[in-house]
A protein has these predicted regions:
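Short, acidic, Ser/Thr-enriched surface-loop or helix-capping motifs
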Residues: 23-24
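Glycine-rich loop-to-alpha-helix module at the N-terminal edge of alpha/beta enzyme cores
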Residues: 28-113
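Short beta-strands and strand-loop turn motifs
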Residues: 30-33, 122, 173-180
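Active-site core of PLP-dependent enzymes with the aminotransferase class I/II
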Residues: 179-187
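PLP-dependent aspartate aminotransferase-fold enzymes
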Residues: 76-173
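Active-site-adjacent loop/helix segments that line or gate small-molecule/cofactor pockets in enzymes
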Residues: 1-17, 34, 167
Length: 187
């Protein structure tokens, strides 16, 4: 029924309350996964439910072709907190990583036509898009999609000497997870 992108666990969650998930048998679980570490907001907090409901009653989705107040407020808060002058909203970590790769390559090209190499770590995971697969250091994800985007180099995680050996004037970026989750919780 669903595309098999994960080995699923035999549990069917039907409800969440705070840090607790409840399955279809009524068993309760502490949610230590948090949406694969992307949702630390808990489940069904009354203020969150109220905010989502209020937004859904106003505008559920508007293309980025147009302005809308909720997006403007979120952008202002992000800019104030970071000190940056621009923000780009994405739907996923893969999209954010795609943008980072594009920014790095564009900036590198401005400095030198050959400054387009991206170093990434073995056992890393950065997404399932074409660009992020090229910097995801796991053969099981890459194999079916070769040839991948060129000029990416895999480095052993935590091997500083290997990193130094491959870091040269052609490198425009290094993408890494401080703690590898998909790669086996390596730090």
């Amino acid at each position: 029924m669903l595309l098999n992108v994960y080995n699923r666990f035999p549990v069917n969650f039907v409800k969440g309350e705070g840090l607790t998930l409840i399955d279809d048998k009524g068993d309760r679980y502490l949610d230590f996964v948090s949406g694969i570490a992307v949702n630390a907001l808990g489940h069904a907090h009354p203020k969150m439910v109220e905010t989502i409901q209020r937004q859904a009653e106003t505008l559920l989705h508007v293309s980025n072709l147009y302005y809308n107040e909720a997006q403007n407020r979120a952008a202002e808060k992000l800019l104030a907190a970071t000190g940056y002058d621009r923000v780009f909203f994405c739907n996923s970590g893969a999209e954010a990583n795609e943008l980072a790769l594009k920014i790095a390559r564009k900036y590198g090209k401005q400095l030198s036509p050959s400054k387009n190499v991206i170093l990434y770590m073995k056992n890393s995971f950065h997404g399932r898009t074409t660009g992020t697969l090229a910097v995801t250091g796991q053969e099981k994800y890459q194999a079916d999609y070769r040839p991948l985007i060129p000029n990416t180099v895999e480095i052993e995680f935590n091997d500083i000497d290997m990193l130094k050996a491959h870091f040269n004037s052609d490198v425009c970026a290094i993408i890494l997870e401080p703690i590898q989750g998909e790669g086996g919780l390596t730090s």
